[in-house]
């Protein structure tokens, strides 16, 4: 289970101001006035995850790490800066080929992020070991069972 980033009151005010502008999730994520917050998210998630990808648990190297939005920011702008929606991921797990813009939420949607139901094992809200068994075979892993 990954510990989420936390924001100061000042950071929350900056984020809320951007939400109120009505921009799309991808545009909010690129907002220049929030660059310091994105840098903080990157540092904190990397530290909290002990430099491991939130999904494949591969080792993360500086420069190859990306911030992953578990619920895609392009589908659900309201969760673009939601702390529980942000984790560090390796380039492979964060690639369009692997993740794309797939829906990860099960309807009906709840505006309170943690009260939603997810189609995936959520690295922040769930305990992955309760849902997935990893087998190390020739330096690769397989998901044996997903509940």
Stretch-by-stretch model annotation:
Residues 9-52, 76-80:
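Short, charged surface segments at domain edges that flank catalytic/cofactor-binding sites
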